[in-house]
């Protein structure tokens, strides 16, 4: 799972811009682009982005754990 790509995808779906997210986070546009490039990010940042975009990115990790457990032989 590449969280940066998933954040960008959600932004695109919502029609939000890099400038908009940068303002919401009080980050530079460069830092938002760096987030898009990251496979993982700090949980505090992910929590803020989840709140701003009104989307639970943490559920993607939970779902991934469930999928992993279902693929493990007993």
Describe each model-derived feature in a short phrase.
Residues 1-20:
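A short, Lys/Arg-rich alpha-helix, primarily the initiator
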Residues 9, 34, 61-74:
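Short, charged recognition helix plus adjacent turn
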Residues 12, 23, 51:
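Alpha-helical residues within the helix-turn-helix
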Residues 19, 30, 58:
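Key DNA-contact positions within bacterial/archaeal DNA-binding proteins
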Residues 26-41:
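Recognition helix of helix-turn-helix/homeodomain-like DNA-binding domains
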Residues 38-51:
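Short, basic-rich loop-to-helix N-cap that marks the start of a DNA-contacting helix
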């Amino acid at each position: 799972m590449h969280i940066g790509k998933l954040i960008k995808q959600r932004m695109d779906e919502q029609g939000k811009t890099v400038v908009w997210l940068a303002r919401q986070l009080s980050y530079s546009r460069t830092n938002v682009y760096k987030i898009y490039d990251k496979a993982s990010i700090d949980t505090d940042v992910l929590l803020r982005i989840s709140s701003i975009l009104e989307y639970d990115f943490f559920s993607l990790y939970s779902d991934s754990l469930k999928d992993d457990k279902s693929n493990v032989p007993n």
